[in-house]
Structure formats: C-alpha cells, structure tokens
Amino acid sequence: MTSTGSTRYDGDSWDLASSVGVTATMVAAARAMATRAENPLINDPYAEPLVRAVGVDLLTRLATGEFNVADLDDDPQRPLGPLGDVADNMAVRTRFFDDFFLDATRAGLEQVVILASGLDARAYRLPWPPQTVVYEIDLPQVIEFKSRTLADLGAAPTADRRVVAVDLREDWPAALRAAGFDPNQPTAWSAEGLLGYLPPEAQDRLLDTVTELSAPGSRLAAECLSSVDPGEEEQIKERMQEVSARWRAHGFDVDMVGLVYFGDRNEAVPYLSDRGWLLTSTPLPELRAANGLAPAAVDDDGPSVDMLYVSGTLYTTPRPDPAP
C-alpha cells in the first residue's frame, strides 16, 4: 500500500474555494448547520457569514439552510446515510476542540497554536481567560481573507490574536517565534482536520516539530483515523468518490480522493506516545454518545474505520533519537 492516490503535489497552492482549501469552507458550512440545530452543541455565529463571503454556491446554501444536506442523499439504490450525520459529527468535533482549549487555558496555559486554522473563529468566539495569546497559522491568502471578512463584520477577538501567515511546508516555526511564541512556555496545540491532508512523511515532520517546540506540560489535540487495513483503503476511496459524485450532481465540483494522502503512515497516537506525550483517544461514536447524540447511521458496506479524537499532555522533555 504505497500509492497516495492524491492529485496534490509539492508546492501546490489553493484558496478557500479551491483544492484542499475548500475543505475549510465545507467545515465552516457544517459548523453553521450545527449552530442552527434545534438544541445546538456549539455556537459559531461567524461560520455562516464566512462561508457566504467565500462564495461557493452550494456551500452557501447549506450554511444558510436554503439547502439541506439530506438532499444530497437522493439515490435510493446507494444511500449515503453517514453524510446525513455531518452536522452532528461536526458539532461534536467542534465541541471537543472547544473544550480542549478552554480546559487547557483555564489550567494556566497562555499560549494557543491553531495549525492550519482555515475559517476557525475560536479567537473571536471562545471566552478565553485573560493573558491568552492565540496564534493562527495558515496560508497568507487564507489569513488575510478571514481577518478582513471578520473585520468587515465588526467582530473583535476575545484573546490576543496573532496571525502567522505561512505555509506549513515552509519554516513556520521561525514565523511563529517571530510572532512572539515562546517555546519555553507550555502551549495548547490543535491539529483539527489536518493530518490526513499531509503526506505521511510531512505528518511525522509536523508532529516532531510540535514536540520540539513544546515545553513539558504542553497539551495537544488532534483528529486522526484509526488504523486502516490495506483492503479497506479502496473501500474508503470508493465511498469518497461516491460522495464527490453527489456533490458534483448539485453543482459543486470537488474530488475528495485527490485531496487526501493515502498509503502507509505512522499512526499519530503511538508516534506521539514514543515522544513523551501521554494521550487518550476517543472514537467518534463514543464522542457522539458522550454528547447525548444517537448512534450515527452505519454503512454496512463501508470500511470499519473510525475517526479518533486525541488529546493529551507532554509529560517529559522530548526523547532524543537513539545514537546510530
């Protein structure tokens, strides 16, 4: 299992309406849907206007409620049951990271780093403790768009928000330090909806760098897939292709398979554990149950993999690599 299956390439670029960047807009649309729920688990008042500002028609209609995600599930021969759970799944994912950040900062951590922040508006909507500094890292065009749009809305950050406009494939640690980040102070890090969009070696490099920049007591939250058997990878691709076809049928041309990287990769939890992180992982079904949601629709023909929500603390200094 060596083929990545991705149409991505070194040095590729994007904005919030194209390539992998559009996934940030999809996520924001799902947050807007979750915010409109009858008994919402989250409240993101900025999700809908940010999606509208990007201007992808179908995502705007989903965010505003003009179009229902259930309308995508219009093939009785091949129902996409799990797609109908997208708003609830996004609600519990968002709540997981919200709670992680609030727990960490209320425990005394004053530095927060959001990797690949996209249209994340936590710096504007969470009740951060005083002295909290929130660093957002993303491409310059993504950072500029979000900052300008939120300013036009009259939104004001609820923490000391510092933008780090840099590609994660470049020297982002230097840019982060230049923005005032202190690696000698404990940090709360998030990698939400990120790892699957990195090549395997880039994932390792990112996790190594985060560890190197983390003082003992730092915390980390991430989203990752459980281990995927070789036979299940093709099932995942087929299911993603079916979902992409439904999107295209409604005027939104996106190739989900081409945006992610498949193939062998280190599992994030044991990889980080070997580097001094003490972690717990919660599968999505358990996270739904913990938030009072009914079990999601099950795809009997789909792969038996779960999304894992991981959080924990760096309890020691990073372990040096063994001598050759």
Curated annotation (Swiss-Prot):
The keyword 4Fe-4S does not apply. Keywords: Methyltransferase, S-adenosyl-L-methionine, Transferase. GO terms for biological process: methylation. Exhibits S-adenosyl-L-methionine-dependent methyltransferase activity. PANTHER family: S-ADENOSYL-L-METHIONINE-DEPENDENT METHYLTRANSFERASE YKTD-RELATED, S-ADENOSYL-L-METHIONINE-DEPENDENT METHYLTRANSFERASES SUPERFAMILY PROTEIN. It is an enzyme of class 2 (transferase). This is Putative S-adenosyl-L-methionine-dependent methyltransferase MMAR_1059. Transmembrane segments: none annotated. Belongs to the UPF0677 family. InterPro entries: Ppm1/Ppm2/Tcmp (IPR007213), SAM-dependent_MTases_sf (IPR029063), SAM_mthyl_Trfase_ML2640-like (IPR011610). S-adenosyl-L-methionine binds at residues 138, 167-168. It comes from Mycobacterium marinum (strain ATCC BAA-535 / M). Its EC number is 2.1.1.-. GO terms for molecular function: methyltransferase activity.
